Structures are given as structure tokens and as C-alpha cells.
Amino acid sequence: MYCAASPRHPELLELAVRVGEAIADRGWTLVSGGGNVSAMGAVAAGARSRGGRTVGVIPKALVHRELADTEADELIVTDTMRQRKQVMEDRSDAFLALPGGIGTLEELFESWTAGYLGMHDKPLVLLDPDGHYDGLRRWLDSLVPTGYVAQAALDRLAVTDDVEAALNLCAGIGRNDRDW
């Protein structure tokens, strides 16, 4: 799960809670960035509210900044951000991103690139109910005719605005409901 660690927008927090609840309802384990703030904390709280298992992965430099999720069933503290991302990739069966900022984008792009290059075949899903990423998606789409981005790379990322559809896509069920 990639999501914001700073904003406190009510609609973002509500979305994160719904995603966490839905993950738990499916009996899945939530693997997230290990913070207890913003959407990151809300998704974990949502999962736990339905009896879900949560795994938080946080670099020691962020333990105090993002207030480590000490309620996680398993809290893994890494030395670096790179180690955090590797542990999250290793422990995840799919990648789901919610609205976020540069940290969310960095994690999303790394997983996206690795999948496009064949380093993993895990589903990669962007849950974007309010059009947070529309500008980014338009820009990326504009790069296809120039050759900077392959259409196949864009097709590797499934985009939806619905929580259940996002989880179905994570499970390999369904199709991308937004065309690039």
C-alpha cells in the first residue's frame, strides 16, 4: 500500500479507512509504510478495525517523524528507504496506491518500472476516485507519441475510482476501467 503520510483531508482519510476495511474483509494482510499518520495510519486502522493483519515497514529515520505504527501486528524497522521498499516489494502480492505526494509517487514509479521491466509480475493499481492523478496521467499519456513512454508501460498500471474494483484488480480480477 502506497499512500500519503502528511495530508489530513477528510475524504482521503475516509478512503484509506474503507480500503483497509476491505483488505481485512478479504482476509488479506496489509503491508504499508509503517507510519501512524495521515492515510498511512488510517488504512492500517481500518484494516485492524475489521480484524485484519497489518505489517508496517518503516526506516528508522522516520520512526519519530511519521510516528511508527506500534499497533501493527508486525513492525519492521529498516536502516534505509531502499530497504523499506525492498521489504515492502518482497512481502506484497500486489501494489495499490492511493492519492499521495512525492513519496507515494516515488514508490509507485519504482514498482511500476520494475513490473514493466519484468522484474515482477504483481498487479499495480492506482485508486484515484477524485482525479488526484489526472494531470500526471495526461502528461504521461502525452509522452507516448514522443517515444519517451511506451504504451505497454502505461498499460501495466490499472487505474480505477472504486475500492472494490481496485482490490479485484489487485487479485488479478477485472480490467482497468480508465483508458490511457
Predicted regions span which residues?
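Short, acidic/small-residue loops that bind anionic groups at enzyme active sites
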Residues: 58, 98, 105, 112-138, ...
